[in-house]
Design a protein with these regions (language model features):
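Solvent-exposed, positively charged interaction surfaces of folded domains
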Residues: 1-192
Length: 192
C-alpha cells in the first residue's frame, strides 16, 4: 500500500531544490540625489570589483544622513567587496554591510510575511501587538514598558526552550531573529 502511494506521489509532484538568491548589501548615507542608472554607473566606474558585476537595486530609503541603498549582486562581486571596508560612490568612501532582507510582520511579529499578508486570525482585523513589549493596544513607538520578545516567549512555551525574552521582537539579540538570518544565509548564493 505504501509503495503505491509513493508511486502516486512521484507521478503527481516534482521535488525541486529552491533557487539561491544573490547576496545584498546596504550602502549607508548617500547624500547625492542620483537616478538608479547614475547610481549603478557610478558604482561600476569607481569600484573595480563591480565593473562587470550583475547589480540590481532593491530599494532605497531615507536615513538620518542621506539615503541608504540596498542592492543585490552576483557572488563574485560580493566576495570581492566583503574584503573591503568601504565602497566608492561619487568620489566618496561610504560604509556598507551585508543586508539580509528580513521580512517581519508588524501585526504578529513573526517572520516570513508582512502585515498585509498576515494570516494570524487574532490580528486579521485591527492592530497587532507591540514589537517592544508584546502587549496589544499600542505601537512600539508609543511603548515605555520593559521589552519582552513575543517570538522567543512563544518558542519557549511551544518547545520548552529557555531563550531570553528581555528584548524587543526586532532586536539583534533575538534567537528567533538569528534563526531567520541563518535561514536567509542558507538560501543565498555565496559561490562555491
Amino acid at each position: 500500500m505504501e509503495l503505491e502511494n509513493l508511486k502516486e506521489v512521484k507521478e503527481n509532484f516534482q521535488i525541486m531544490k529552491p533557487s539561491l538568491k544573490d547576496p545584498n548589501i546596504v550602502i549607508f548615507n548617500i547624500t547625492d540625489e542620483l537616478s538608479n542608472e547614475e547610481f549603478i554607473d557610478s558604482l561600476r566606474a569607481q569600484n573595480e570589483d563591480l565593473t562587470n558585476a550583475t547589480l540590481k537595486i532593491r530599494t532605497s530609503y531615507k536615513s538620518k544622513f542621506g539615503k541608504n541603498w540596498i542592492i543585490s549582486m552576483d557572488h563574485v562581486a560580493f566576495n570581492a567587496l566583503k574584503k573591503r571596508k568601504n565602497i566608492n560612490l561619487n568620489w566618496q568612501m561610504l560604509s556598507f554591510k551585508e543586508n539580509f532582507r528580513i521580512i517581519q510582520c508588524f501585526k504578529c511579529a513573526n517572520y516570513g510575511h508582512t502585515a498585509m499578508t498576515c494570516r494570524d486570525e487574532e490580528f486579521k482585523t485591527g492592530g497587532g501587538i507591540c514589537l517592544r513589549c508584546a502587549d496589544k493596544g499600542h505601537r512600539e513607538r508609543e511603548c515605555h514598558a520593559d521589552p519582552k520578545c513575543s517570538n522567543c516567549t512563544s518558542h519557549n512555551l511551544k518547545f520548552g526552550s529557555t531563550f531570553k525574552t528581555d528584548h524587543s521582537a526586532r532586536s539583534n539579540d533575538c534567537k528567533i531573529r538569528e534563526k531567520e538570518i541563518d535561514f536567509i544565509i542558507s538560501r543565498t548564493n555565496y559561490g562555491p
